[in-house]
Amino acid sequence: LNFLSFSTLAFDEAGGAHNPTQIARALARRGHRVLFVEPQPSATRNAEHLPFEIVALTELGLTPTQLRRAWFGLETEEPETVGHALLERFAKFLPNETRIAIFSAPFDPFVRLVPFLRAHEFLIVYYAMDDFAAAPALGHTQFAPAAEDYLVRDADVLCAVTPHTARTLERFGKTAHVIPNGIALETFQTRKNARPAQIERGELTLGFWGTLIDSMFDAGLVAHVAQMRPQWNIHLLGARDPEPHRPSIVARLKQFENIFFHGAAPHEELPRYAAACDVMLAPFPDNAFTRGRDPLKIYEYLAAHKPVAASYAPQLTALPYVFVAQTPDEFLATIERAAQTRVEEHALDVFLEQQSWDARAGALLETVRDITPQARSGGEILPTFADPDAQTIMRYAEMLERELEQTQRWARELERGAQMRGGLKRFLPSRAKRN
């Protein structure tokens, strides 16, 4: 089979541990050919000598400005150039056999290509990584509700990572298959004997890794733990939220002496940090988006043979050594319970082997077996699904102003350097002096 995989995450983001990259790799390892489409070029593109090729939207004709506008949920020009460039790349890379396009998120520049792809005999699969119907309320403007509605109605096959998200996809009467996330065990198996990271230990040492975004990380819950258990140390690994309009996790928690920020760590270093911790944390906020998630970090924590204390995610209770709380005080008790739990490593490894990405790819292949693409007339590019509100437009304008200020600072530095060397006198416009 030939797959076209659309991902809003870069191929190498989070060390390539995320669903779209791992599913694409697993399909390629099974001998299927895969063309992976990411927003902009990854820093690393290791295809492991597999029948696998990676291309970015910006390499297919979408300008950086158009991509940035799409990320803010604003209208972009018709991506017809992208569609033709993509088809040309696809035709060169893949033979003329069964064609399957996988969409992992309702991103406007991707979804608008659906009729164009149908006209070229693609089967359309929507494999939802999250409950994107709940995403806009949390400020994730790149996922348009109308784009997801279109995908849900038009896709030949619907899949989701949790039963909750599958139920949201079934709102128009179709059946959705549940295919959870998986785990790349090799990262953790090859580093089992690595020395633990040298971090400040407490009576209990708690760890977390992931992006520090308020829609996915309950800072108030972690503050409660830090305040009620000052003898415990909490270590947070992850990049800060780049969006200034959202509450800052770091600003909220930096007052606590028993909370330590380590920034983003290479994915291959995560086992060392886990080895230094007693319990790993998944402090999710209480919202619909949380209830639709199947967090990769949970599988990674388990692969490191660590018990997990999570919050507001009842879908995780079926996983071994994952303890889920529904209130702040329950979260404290859950951490203590997890710390007292002895992990049976062999039994856990047997369980995790069944959660491999190869198994997930096999389940996906079963869902598309014997499915015939819906016959549709026309192959036009869809109009934009963007419908930004005033707040979104203001955030975009503020971002442009920040970039302008950064550019002006850069120009002033160049100007000063040039003046010192007797070069050009001015890069920036200046007002004429009054007499």
Protein language model features and the residues they cover:
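Nucleotide-sugar-dependent
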Residues: 14, 18, 213, 266-273, ...
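Membrane-proximal helix-turn-helix segments that form the acceptor-binding/catalytic region
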Residues: 140-158
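Nucleotide-activated donor-binding/catalytic signature segment of Leloir-type glycosyltransferases, i.e.
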Residues: 238, 246-271
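A charged, aromatic-enriched C-terminal amphipathic alpha-helix characteristic of glycosyltransferases
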Residues: 340-373
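Boundary detector for helix-to-coil junctions that initiate low-complexity/charged tails
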Residues: 374-435
